[in-house]
Amino acid sequence: MFRIFIGWDSREAECADILRHSLIKHSSIPLDIRYLKIDELGLHRPRDPLQSTEFTYTRFLVPHLCNFEGKAVFMDCDMVCLGDIKELDDLDMTGLALRVVQHDYKPEATSKMDGCVQTVYPRKNWSSLMLMNCSMLKLWTKEVVDTQTGKFLHRFEGIPDEQIGEIPKTWNTLDWMDENTKLIHYTSGGPWFEQCKDHPYGEAWLRARDEYRASLRPAAAFA
């Protein structure tokens, strides 16, 4: 089964459920989907004042959680899948530690949807979707994730550039979409936030939310 780890935040718990539902809906292969809940992972690092989510650092534990074997995907929870994730499973990882969408992203806003500071740094948003070759990411031990800087982790310092491959850009479109989009990422805030309820591409998330909630009704009625 293709392993997928979704970053989980207590403020956006339903977002993770909606993403999970959208992944399963469109997938032609079996998926093993897990949530990265910080309270269950044994990290002891103090909260970074610049981190905007509970999974800012937990994403880098994925190779450790996979015993540094096989492939796995990490995804932020503020996404909706519109394509078959098998396309990522089919990507060749020979000689690569990672594949990511290599954005050249420079946000215009100075703050995020929840009031956190919007920092700008090289390779911003590259770590929001990662296809990992876990056997080549032994650098990311639990101790390293617990102690290293955000700069070291999010910029993939210590990983040679030639070991960082690309994922097609259709698999992580930032706050927009078209007919080719496979995964939309509401990185500036989605319609679940009051201040973003009129997001120009929010309809995709609202539709996925309604489908997810509808999927719960038969079980609730039966109970």
Region locations from a protein language model:
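A glycosyltransferase accessory/donor-loop signature
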Residues: M1-F5, R11, I29, I33-K37, ...
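Short, acidic, metal-binding catalytic loop of nucleotide-sugar glycosyltransferases
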Residues: S22-P30
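Short, P/G- and charge-enriched loop/turn segments at secondary-structure junctions
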Residues: D48-Q51, D114-T119
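GT-A fold catalytic core of metal-dependent nucleotide-sugar glycosyltransferases
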Residues: T58-P107, L131-K138
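Extracellular structured ligand-interaction cores
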Residues: F60, W126-L129, T181-L183
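A gly/proline- and charged-residue-enriched helix-loop-helix capping module
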Residues: V100-K112, Q118, K124-W126, T141
